Amino acid sequence: VVGGDECNINEHRSLVAIF
């Protein structure tokens, strides 16, 4: 994902929310 740590954190939170 292009964007940086913030983007990575956002995706990680979304994955955690889904699971």
UniProtKB/Swiss-Prot annotation:
Monomer. Residues 1-19 form the Peptidase S1 domain. Signal peptide: none annotated. Its EC number is 3.4.21.-. N-glycosylated. GO terms for cellular component: extracellular region. Thrombin-like snake venom serine protease. Causes the specific clotting of fibrinogen (FGA) with release of fibrinopeptide A. The aberrant fibrinogen is then incapable of being cross-linked, forming easily dispersible clots. It is an enzyme of class 3 (hydrolase). Expressed by the venom gland. It is found in: Secreted. One of its GO terms (molecular function) is toxin activity. This is Thrombin-like enzyme TL-BJ 2. Its main location: secreted. Inhibited by PMSF, but not by hirudin. Keywords: Blood coagulation cascade activating toxin, Glycoprotein, Hemostasis impairing toxin, Hydrolase, Protease, Secreted, Serine protease, Toxin. Disulfide bonds: none annotated. GO terms for biological process: proteolysis. Belongs to the peptidase S1 family. Snake venom subfamily.
